[in-house]
């Protein structure tokens, strides 16, 4: 087995498909650094299942895909295929050549193939592990692998030997067994808990099963006794049947008379039906008219309410205007204008005084300056002459230029001051105008707020009215639905599935008058009491005499239609003698209204029955009058020596019919209420829509006013800010001008002084002046003039401020007066418009009230017409129902008379009815046909011995006693009755019996036995798995021990070759535990006493690691080895020694060596040259060294 070829497509730097063909021996791969030699090693490791990106010298696994260059785009996948020659069957697969392919895509997906078939990574690893190539890839010695071997933990070094020895598959088998053991432990604990719990439950359930078994025996005995009693009853009733015959001629005469009466009644019924149809159409039309008028009345009422509220609102809403009188504002404006003129005059006077004070001050300052100059002239005359006239002249020009600059600045500031004052005045005027408009809008806002609140309140009332009517309508509709459902449910209760229903559907014309519930009427509230007294007769059919009843029973029997109760018409009965009812009671006969033909039967059934309130009164009444029967309103019936009642009583047909009638009356009233509420709701919805529109309009007007006021306030803020800014600028500019004027005064004084000095210097002789000037008097006069000038300037400032304060105030007041007049005109116009609107609303309200009055009268008239038509229709329907009942009764009578020709069958039918009831009871309770019952349990059948007697007999026979077999016992009714009671008593003594105990016990016992078997199976399986683990441990121990022994021996030999005279050996860290022990490496090169591997040189470490790998290779050879620059750190001597080992390995394995060393190339059988041009893509060429011939082994 050896590597035949390696194909790379898009793997790392191999952008183009490249195939490297190998042969046995040593193959050297050479090339410059960075050309992609190690990528060949990475490709081999990757295709054989390597999963570590760092092992492949990358950050993530996707880094193996060609990333592209400046001239080549990146690829989307990487693919590597290695082909292995398997002619020696080293791999456990039936192919002489095996190809393994691995692909990776940019999205991280991977694919594996073996000979073109998809497979898993595990399949690849298991295939290679059997040939000594495990997941650790010890056959691939990459860069840094030598250091890793020596620096790894002893346990990691053990993994190299285990992989070479093929221990991995045994460890996988052990791990799999241990995982199964872990899972099995949970199942074993669960099974143990279940069996323990089932064992605990079996004992009490067994006791319950024994009780159930005993109950079955007693129940069988009880069933036998009851069956024999039922068979005796059936035989006795069959002997009671008799036949009665009536005269046929009398029946025929009565039949002809009834037929004539039936024809007359049928014609009358047709006339009633026609008239009722016409009345129904008229009533429906009137009902629709009433509904439309009611809705219109509700809408008119809503319109009246809205118009009344609007008129009241318009009358009460005040029209607000400003509180200021425009004439007063104009008078104030005139007064302010006069004050402004006076202030301007005062300002002119103050300015005139200021000019005089300034002239006086200038004169005094001039005199003072002349005095100073005269005083200083003599002192500085000589100095000034020495300083030179040129410098003084320059200073004079400079100071004059400064004065001119100050004059220009003052002029500009004066212009800016006037502009700022004008802007401030304009902003104040606009502010006052806008402020007046804001006041007007605020006054109008109050009215809009009030109007909006009123419209919202009106809308809320309309919403509440609509919600109230909708809730009432829903309640009424729910009531209608509930009543209809109740009527339907009660009608379902009237649908019978017994003989009564069969007779009604199939035999109604043969003497059957109809159900008793429809033929009789009971006073409201007494239905339950009368139904309790009538019993089954309350649900019975009325038959037209004895013959009709006989015929009906015969038809039932023939058709097997079930059982039915019949009340006989024209039954002879003497009316009871009138007597007062007992105190607190009513006679039952007085509470029922029945047709005359049924009066006899009703009298027979209800005679002597009194109706009382409660059971105590009934018991007391019967105790006082034993001949009477008493019944309570709840249906409890009391007689002499007996009481019947309770709560488990179903409603009779009579009661159900009465309930249907009551529900029908309530349904009609509820439907009328729904119609009234619908009409009212229609009008309320119209009112709600109108008030919704009013509220939305009021809200829109309010929002518009709010927007206008907000805009005005924003404008006020802007104008106020502009006024304040202008005033601040005016004040600031005034201060700047005053400062400049003060500086100008000082500069002018300096200029004057310099000019005087210059003039004195030019004119004054060298001798000083003869006489000084009186300077003190001049200085005092100057100070007085300066004080007067300051006071005059302050007076001008004060006058200017007062004038500015009132400037434009008169114009503002005049504009406010004009605005107030306009507001008053608009208010008057609004007042007149509201008055007109109020008049219109009042007129609408009055007209609406008049229309509402008329509509109410029309609605009332329509209601009366509707009620009259309804009453007439009800009367017509009642009359038609009476005629229909008469027609039905006559039809039944005619049919009954026809069938009554066979009246002799009535007695037999009555007996048959009783027998059928008994047979039905036997069939329902015991599931036996009457014939089988009599044949097996009839009175003629003797009773067999009981199980107890037979058991005693068998025991006596077993004891050898001379006994006779128990003889059958003849039937005896009292004995069977006692037998049945005894069985019932024994069954009651058993208490509560679990009928499913026998089945539950059997099922639980079966489950317990099954789980016990499963538990034993799991224990056995666990024992087998533990045996597998022990077996695998033993196999691992054996394989590892043998491999370690061989590797240890080979390591000593290989170390001696690489280090002649040196000593190296392998040592186990824990020899007592060969399953987990690690492996330490001890190496002592010749002439050195080293105890730690870290003290070895780099070359010595590399040789030591190579020695261990070669020892493993020789002890457990692998088909091929790949080495990546393992000899890079060796000198020539050690390299030759290593090459000698390569030549030894070449004999049994294929070597692929990445190298830069020439000696290594010399021993190679083939050379592969790997290059990389400027495009970053690897290219490969090859050279076969043996035979000095060149073969092309690479396809690119």
Curated annotation (Swiss-Prot):
Residues 168-288, 327-497, 654-829, 972-1026 form a coiled coil. CDD domains: ABC_SMC_barmotin. InterPro entries: P-loop_NTPase (IPR027417), RecF/RecN/SMC_N (IPR003395), SMC (IPR024704), SMC_hinge (IPR010935), SMC_hinge_sf (IPR036277), SMC_prok (IPR011890). Residues 510-621 form the SMC hinge domain. Belongs to the SMC family. Contains large globular domains required for ATP hydrolysis at each terminus and a third globular domain forming a flexible SMC hinge near the middle of the molecule. These domains are separated by coiled-coil structures. This is Chromosome partition protein Smc. It is found in: Cytoplasm. GO terms for molecular function: ATP binding; ATP hydrolysis activity; DNA binding. ATP binds at residues 32-39. Required for chromosome condensation and partitioning. Homodimer. It comes from the Bacteria. The keyword DNA-binding applies. Its main location: cytoplasm. It comes from Mycolicibacterium paratuberculosis (strain ATCC BAA-968 / K-10) (Mycobacterium paratuberculosis). One of its GO terms (biological process) is sister chromatid cohesion. One of its GO terms (cellular component) is cytoplasm. Keywords: ATP-binding, Coiled coil, Cytoplasm, DNA-binding, Nucleotide-binding. The lineage of its organism: Bacteria, Bacillati, Actinomycetota, Actinomycetes, Mycobacteriales. It holds the Pfam family SMC_N. The gene is smc.
């Amino acid at each position: 087995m050896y590597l035949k070829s390696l194909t790379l497509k898009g793997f790392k730097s191999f952008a183009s498909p490249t195939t490297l063909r190998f042969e046995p021996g040593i193959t050297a791969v050479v090339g410059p650094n960075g050309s992609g030699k190690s990528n060949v090693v990475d490709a081999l490791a990757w295709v054989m299942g390597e999963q570590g990106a760092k092992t492949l010298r990358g950050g993530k696994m996707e880094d193996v895909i060609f990333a592209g260059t400046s001239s080549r785009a990146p690829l989307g996948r990487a693919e590597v295929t290695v082909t292995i020659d398997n002619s020696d069957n080293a791999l456990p697969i039936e192919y002489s050549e095996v190809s393994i392919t691995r692909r990776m895509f940019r999205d991280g997906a991977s694919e594996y193939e073996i000979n073109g078939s998809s497979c898993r990574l595990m399949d690849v690893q298991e295939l290679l592990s059997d040939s000594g190539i495990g997941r650790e890839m010890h056959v691939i010695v990459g860069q840094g692998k030598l250091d890793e071997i020596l620096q790894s933990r002893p346990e990691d070094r053990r993994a190299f030997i285990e992989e070479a020895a093929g221990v991995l598959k045994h460890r996988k088998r052990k791990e799999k067994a241990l995982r199964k053991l872990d899972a099995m432990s949970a199942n074993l604990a669960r099974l143990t808990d279940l069996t323990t719990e089932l064992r605990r439950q079996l004992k009490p359930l067994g006791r319950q099963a024994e009780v159930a078994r005993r109950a079955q025996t007693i129940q069988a005995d009880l069933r036998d006794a009851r069956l024999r009693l039922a068979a005796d009853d059936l035989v006795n009733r069959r002997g009671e049947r008799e036949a009665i015959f009536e005269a046929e001629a009398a029946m025929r005469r009565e039949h002809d008379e009834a037929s004539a009466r039936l024809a007359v009644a049928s014609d009358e019924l047709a006339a009633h039906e026609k008239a009722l149809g016409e009345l129904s159409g008229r009533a429906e039309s009137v009902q629709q008219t009433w509904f439309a008028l009611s809705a219109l009345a509700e809408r008119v009422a809503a319109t009246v309410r809205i118009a009344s509220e609007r008129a009241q609102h318009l009358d009460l809403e005040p029209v607000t205007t400003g509180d200021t009188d425009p004439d007063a504002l104009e008078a104030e404006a005139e007064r302010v204008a006069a004050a402004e003129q006076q202030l301007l005059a005062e300002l002119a006077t103050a300015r005139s005084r200021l000019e005089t004070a300034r002239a006086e001050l200038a004169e005094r300052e001039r005199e003072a300056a002349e005095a100073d100059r005269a005083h200083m002239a003599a002192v500085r005359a000589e100095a000034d002459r020495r300083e030179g006239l040129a410098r003084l002249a320059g200073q004079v020009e400079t100071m004059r230029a400064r004065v001119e600059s100050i004059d220009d600045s003052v002029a500009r500031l004066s212009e800016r001051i006037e502009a700022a004052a004008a802007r401030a005045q304009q902003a104040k005027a606009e502010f006052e105008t806008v402020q007046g408009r804001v006041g007007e809008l605020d006054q109008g806002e109050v009215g809009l707020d009030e109007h909006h609140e009123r419209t919202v309140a009106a809308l809320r009332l309309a919403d509440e009215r609509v919600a109230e009517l909708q809730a009432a309508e829903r309640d009424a509709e729910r009531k209608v639905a509930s009543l209809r459902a109740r009527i339907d449910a009660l009608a379902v209760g009237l649908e019978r599935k017994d003989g009564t229903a069969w007779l009604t559907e199939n035999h109604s014309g043969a003497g059957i008058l109809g159900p008793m519930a429809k033929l009789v009427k009971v006073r409201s509230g007494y239905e339950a009491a009368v139904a309790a007294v009538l019993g089954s007769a309350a649900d019975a059919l009325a038959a037209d005499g004895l013959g009709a009843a006989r015929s009906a029973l015969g038809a039932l029997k023939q058709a097997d239609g079930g059982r039915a109760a019949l009340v006989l018409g024209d039954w002879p009965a003497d009316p009871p003698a009138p007597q007062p009812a007992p105190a607190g009671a009513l006679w039952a006969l007085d509470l029922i209204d029945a047709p005359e033909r049924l009066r006899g039967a009703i009298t027979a059934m209800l005679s002597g029955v009194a109706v009382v309130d409660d059971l105590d009164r009934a018991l007391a009444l019967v105790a006082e009058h034993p001949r009477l029967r008493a019944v309570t309103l709840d249906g409890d019936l009391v007689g002499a020596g007996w009481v019947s009642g309770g709560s488990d009583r179903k409603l009779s047909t009579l009661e159900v019919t009465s309930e249907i009638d009551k529900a029908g009356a309530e349904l009609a009233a509820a439907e009328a209420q729904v119609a009234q509420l619908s009409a009212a709701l229609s009008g309320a919805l119209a009112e709600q829509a109108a008030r919704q529109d009013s509220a939305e309009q009021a809200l829109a007007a309010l929002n518009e006013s709010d927007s206008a006021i907000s805009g005005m306030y924003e404008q006020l803020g802007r104008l106020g800010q502009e006024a304040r800014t202008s005033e601040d600028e005016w004040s600031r500019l005034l201060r700047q001008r005053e400062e400049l004027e003060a500086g100008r005064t000082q500069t002018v004084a300096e200029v004057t002084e310099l000019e005087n000095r210059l003039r004195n210097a030019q004119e004054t002789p060298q001798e000083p002046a003869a006489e000084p000037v009186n300077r003190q008097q001049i200085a005092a006069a100057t100070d007085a003039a300066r004080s007067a000038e300051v006071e005059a300037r302050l007076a001008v400032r004060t006058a200017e401020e007062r004038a500015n304060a009132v400037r434009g105030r008169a114009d503002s007041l005049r504009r406010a007066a004009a605005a107030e007049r306009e507001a008053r005109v608009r208010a008057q116009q609004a007042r007149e418009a509201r008055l007109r609107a109020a008049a219109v609303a009042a007129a609408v309200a009055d007209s609406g009230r008049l229309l509402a009055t008329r509509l109410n009268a029309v609605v009332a008239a329509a209601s009366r017409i509707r009620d009259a038509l309804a009453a007439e229709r009800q009367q017509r329907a009642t009359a038609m129902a009476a005629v229909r009942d008469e027609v039905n009764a006559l039809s039944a009578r005619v049919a009954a008379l026809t069938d009554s020709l066979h009246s002799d069958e009535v007695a037999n039918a009555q007996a048959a009815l009783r027998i059928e009831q008994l047979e039905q009871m036997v069939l329902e309770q015991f599931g036996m046909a009457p014939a089988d019952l009599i044949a097996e349990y009839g009175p003629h059948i003797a009773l067999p011995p009981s199980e107890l007697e037979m058991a005693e007999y068998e025991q006596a026979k077993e004891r050898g006693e001379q006994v006779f077999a128990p003889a059958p016992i003849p039937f005896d009714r009292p004995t069977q009755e006692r037998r049945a009671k005894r069985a019932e008593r024994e069954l009651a003594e058993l208490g509560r019996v679990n009928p499913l105990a026998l089945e539950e016990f059997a099922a639980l016992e079966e489950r317990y036995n099954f789980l016990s078997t499963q538990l034993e199976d799991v224990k056995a399986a666990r024992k087998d798995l533990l045996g597998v683990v022990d077996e695998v441990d033993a196999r691992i121990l054996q394989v590892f021990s043998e491999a370690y022994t061989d590797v240890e021996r080979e390591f000593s030999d290989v170390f001696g070759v690489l280090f002649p005279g040196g000593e190296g050996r392998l040592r186990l860290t824990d020899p007592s535990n060969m399953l987990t022990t690690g492996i330490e490496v001890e190496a002592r090169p010749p002439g050195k006493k080293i105890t730690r591997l870290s003290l070895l040189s780099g070359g010595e470490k590399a040789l030591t690691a190579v020695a261990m790998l070669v020892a493993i290779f020789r002890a457990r050879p692998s088909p091929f080895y790949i080495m990546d620059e393992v000899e890079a750190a060796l000198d020539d001597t050690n390299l030759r020694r290593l090459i000698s080992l390569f030549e030894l390995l070449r004999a049994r394995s294929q070597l692929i060596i990445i190298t830069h060393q020439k000696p290594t190339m010399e021993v190679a059988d083939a050379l592969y040259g790997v290059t990389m041009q400027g495009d970053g893509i690897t290219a490969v060429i090859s050279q076969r060294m043996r035979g000095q011939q060149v073969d092309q082994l690479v396809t690119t």
